[in-house]
Amino acid sequence: MTTDVTHVTAGVTTFFQGEHQSHPLFRIEPGIPCQDAREQASELMGYVRELTIVGLMDEKPMMIWASHYLSAMAKALMDDAELGMRG
């Protein structure tokens, strides 16, 4: 599969802003092909799904929190890829 490198991440989306969403701790890197970013987001969401199920079924809240943070990463990847695809 060929990757369209004309559309790349913008590098402006932050995630996990810390207490009260006031401190950007992580940012998506600019210049990543949007297709790659979207594929990685999909992979992360698969992990989110599995961790959520394990956390609920086994009553392990740490798994739920892990899935929460991974979903924030996946959302940031998708949001930044969307910005990159818009131009």
Regions found by a protein language model. Name each.
Residues M1-G87:
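Sequence/structural signature of long amphipathic alpha-helices
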